[in-house]
């Protein structure tokens, strides 16, 4: 008679974050057992679970933000970038995002169907862009400009997946300070991603000045390779016309702040986001200088426009009025910064078309916000069907927090813990 089989030791949740880090294998086993079970979008998610999930999103995008900032500076110094530290940071963040999207797709926690589809479309676009970018390098040689189609796919995919994360958190987090802080963090990453293409000119204008002064930080092989590709130093460091930087800053980045201000709802949302972003860039500037990497110009004019955005939304000004005021003040602030310091090349004649275009975009946003589509967007889509009392992933009674109904933003979505496989 064979000896009785000993039962497998129970896998318990770590008692603290320190214990979780001390025993990572046990942590993974516990997470896999309790949370990697099939479920539909809208699955019951407690407040604590929601905070942990979206904290992981914040960490992932923090890695991507630091990596991308360093990567731009890296490409103004070195030609080689295989296994470069900024690429490794960015890749670590991307790997975390892939894991999170797989988790949401399989388990259904913390997202509705629309948020999940945005996350999936975003990471899919990003991953498809990687081989396209590699092929672009093989066919066209050196391509460090952030304005190339393959690079545009990368930050477009990032924007789409961030939109999904913003939606998921805003739908299911209970109103309060935690909801506002995490939302501000996600919107900060969205703003940084929107501003990312403009960094080429912001690094390039200083690198070109150093080159002309005979003090370039770029290695000779980088400049030689650029010349072999038929590019002059000016074309290499400032690859787009001088109307592009102001047009993108106003029509894309300020519009991002308008949407963030409307969604988050705090009075100084746009100002806080712009100031935090500029503070981050200032710290990065100092660290890059210490490390011998090229620094960049800071787009301080963004802060002036952000203040006007907050005031215009608070005063309930029509979009065409707010757009003219915010765009005009941004151009005036840029002119002052140009007189006192340095900015990338701006075509000042573009002020009229850019400000008018921004006013039209803001007015269109006002109209969209009043539409039936916008009203339907605020409600969760295709939640998991209710099936009795809420339970967690292993059938225990779930710690369901109180909150608004599932049809309202901020709902925690109380549904059955175990959902059928999709």
Task: For the regions a language model picked out, list residue spans one by one.
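N-terminal signal-anchor module of multipass membrane proteins
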Residues: 2-99, 366
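Aromatic-anchored segments of alpha-helical transmembrane domains
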Residues: 63-68, 124-134, 188-199, 273-286, ...
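Non-cytosolic membrane-interface motifs at loop->transmembrane helix junctions
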Residues: 80-88, 141-152, 294-296, 345-352
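Hydrophobic cores of alpha-helical transmembrane segments in multi-pass inner/ER membrane proteins
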Residues: 88-105, 153-169, 244-258, 299-312, ...
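Short, highly charged, low-complexity non-transmembrane loops/tails of multi-pass membrane proteins
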Residues: 372-404, 408-421
């Amino acid at each position: 008679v064979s000896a009785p089989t000993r039962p497998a030791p129970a896998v318990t949740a770590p008692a603290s974050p320190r214990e979780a880090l001390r025993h990572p294998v046990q942590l993974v086993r516990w997470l896999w057992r309790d949370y990697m079970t099939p479920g539909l979008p809208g699955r019951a998610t407690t407040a604590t679970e929601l905070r942990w999930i979206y904290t992981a999103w914040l960490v992932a995008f923090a890695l991507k933000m630091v990596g991308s900032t360093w990567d731009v500076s890296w490409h103004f110094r070195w030609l080689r970038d295989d296994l470069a530290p900024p690429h490794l940071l960015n890749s670590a963040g991307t790997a975390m995002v892939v894991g999170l999207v797989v988790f949401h797709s399989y388990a259904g926690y913390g997202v509705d169907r629309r948020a999940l589809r945005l996350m999936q479309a975003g990471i899919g676009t990003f991953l498809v862009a990687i081989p396209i970018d590699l092929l672009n390098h093989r066919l066209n040689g050196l391509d460090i400009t952030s304005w190339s189609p393959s690079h545009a796919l990368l930050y477009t995919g990032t924007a789409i997946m961030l939109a999904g994360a913003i939606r998921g958190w805003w739908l299911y987090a209970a109103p309060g300070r935690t909801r506002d802080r995490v939302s501000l963090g996600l919107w900060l990453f969205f703003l940084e991603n929107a501003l990312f293409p403009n960094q080429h000119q912001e690094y390039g204008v200083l690198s070109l000045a150093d080159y002309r002064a005979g003090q370039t930080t770029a290695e000779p092989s980088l400049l030689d390779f650029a010349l072999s590709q038929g590019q002059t130093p000016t074309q290499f460091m400032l690859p787009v016309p001088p109307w592009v930087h102001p047009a993108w800053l106003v029509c894309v980045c300020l519009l991002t702040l308008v949407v963030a201000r409307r969604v988050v709802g705090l009075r100084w949302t746009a100002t806080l986001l712009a100031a935090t972003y500029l503070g981050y860039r200032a710290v990065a500037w100092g660290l890059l200088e210490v490390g011998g990497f090229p620094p960049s110009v800071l787009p301080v004019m963004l802060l002036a426009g952000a203040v006007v955005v907050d005031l215009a939304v608070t005063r309930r000004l029509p979009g065409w009025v707010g757009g003219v005021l915010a765009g005009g003040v941004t151009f005036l602030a840029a002119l002052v910064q140009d007189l006192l310091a340095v900015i990338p090349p701006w075509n000042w004649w573009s002020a009229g078309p850019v400000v008018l275009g921004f006013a039209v975009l803001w007015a269109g946003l006002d109209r969209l916000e009043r539409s039936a589509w916008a009203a339907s967007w605020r409600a969760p889509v295709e939640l998991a069907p209710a099936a009795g009392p809420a339970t967690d992933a292993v059938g225990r009674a779930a710690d369901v927090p109180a909150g608004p109904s599932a049809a309202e933003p901020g709902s925690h979505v109380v549904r059955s813990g175990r959902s059928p496989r999709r």
